[in-house]
Amino acid sequence: MSRVVLAYSGGLDTSVCIELLRERYGYDEVITVTADVGQPEEELREAEEKARKLADEHFTVDCVDEFVCEYCWRAVKANATYEGYPLSTALARPLIAQKVLEVARDVDADAVAHGCTGKGNDQFRFESYLRAHGGEEFEIVAPVRDLNLTRDEEIAYAEERGIPVPVDVDSPYSVDENLWGRSIEGGVLEDPSEEPPEEVFEWTVSPAEAPDEPEVVEIEFEDGVPVEVDGRDDPVEIVRYLNETAGEHGVGRIDIIEDRVIGLKSREVYEAPAAVTLLEAHRALEAFTLTRRELSLKASLEEEWARLVYDGLWFNPLREHLEAFFDSTQRHVEGTVRVKLFKGSATVISRESPRALYEEELISYEEKQFDQRTAEGAVKLHGLQERLALRRRG
């Protein structure tokens, strides 16, 4: 008996994949796996109910704590964004792929499958991990891509077979959610000249409709990661709280043109209130506690880390080398940052740290502890190479 394990979200793509794997690929059993990485409880419940009707067996794997502590907190240390996007979907994919492989081994499956299209990034993220960690054990199947299905064709296929799906031709948005962020694609969003309609947003209010009074949150960091926010010290609760609180003030909306792995440019809309707030606070604390050269080198390495994750290369050895450097710097990133949330902005208004490299007595114009006359020699030498180049090169 042939058996395939499908990474299952409950959305259109993965729902039609269940029947396609039987009908077009001939698998006798289709087993679905949903990884809980912080999706809304209602979404998880609906996915599980649907999977139990459509699939032969279903597993929901709780990995939200692991997602925050082992993935999101690494992203905070790396100040990770790709072209302005905090990598929410990209961060979750290797963890989901790992859980799919674990179930596939437990049930003695012949193959693993995903519902990614041939135009998106997730096919790279899932398959690179699956091939690296299970390519010799399992066949990898991608029905939507391999059958070259359009979204309208998937909707029609679902309607013909009575497969319940959360979209139709009048509301064709594709949404992916985890605790670190929410991504929205499709429909009118594919026209970059059109403003995203308010109906696509769920986590954030319109900045114009946000409260007229700002709210300040206090974030405490140790070793570069948040350990307490307004009295909350559980990692998952910290992210949930900031998603709710910052979202109420319109913080975290992102609308960008993004360069996909495959080479296409796409219009992407995201909501990431907690990620945006935490990254803003973390950068401010780093500027307070790290040297200029540490910050400069780290900025270039952060870009490389983010690109690895975005491209689906979580398992690349370079990521671990980069994180070794990040971890070394983060030993000094300790302190408290206060962030004001107001009508779409998250603004750092204060920072305190026992490891601060800021010395008020030295920088103050009212103090004489720093002898200004000692700067004369440095000023004379500053730009020496540039002056020589100007003379000798004309």
UniProtKB/Swiss-Prot annotation:
L-citrulline binds at Y85, N121, R125, S174, S183, E258, Y270. One of its GO terms (cellular component) is cytoplasm. InterPro entries: Arginosuc_syn_C (IPR048268), Arginosuc_syn_N (IPR048267), Arginosuc_synth (IPR001518), Arginosuc_synth_CS (IPR018223), Arginosuc_synth_type_1_subfam (IPR023434), AS_cat/multimer_dom_body (IPR024074), Rossmann-like_a/b/a_fold (IPR014729). Gene3D superfamilies: Argininosuccinate synthetase, chain A, domain 2 (3.90.1260.10), HUPs (3.40.50.620). Pathway: Amino-acid biosynthesis; L-arginine biosynthesis; L-arginine from L-ornithine and carbamoyl phosphate: step 2/3. It is an enzyme of class 6 (ligase). It is found in: Cytoplasm. Keywords: Amino-acid biosynthesis, Arginine biosynthesis, ATP-binding, Cytoplasm, Ligase, Nucleotide-binding. GO terms for molecular function: argininosuccinate synthase activity; ATP binding. It holds the Pfam family Arginosuc_synth. ATP binds at A7, Y8, S9, G10, G11, L12, D13, T14, S15, A35, G115. It catalyses: L-citrulline + L-aspartate + ATP = 2-(N(omega)-L-arginino)succinate + AMP + diphosphate + H(+). Its EC number is 6.3.4.5. L-aspartate binds at T117, N121, D122. Belongs to the argininosuccinate synthase family. Type 1 subfamily. Homotetramer. This is Argininosuccinate synthase.
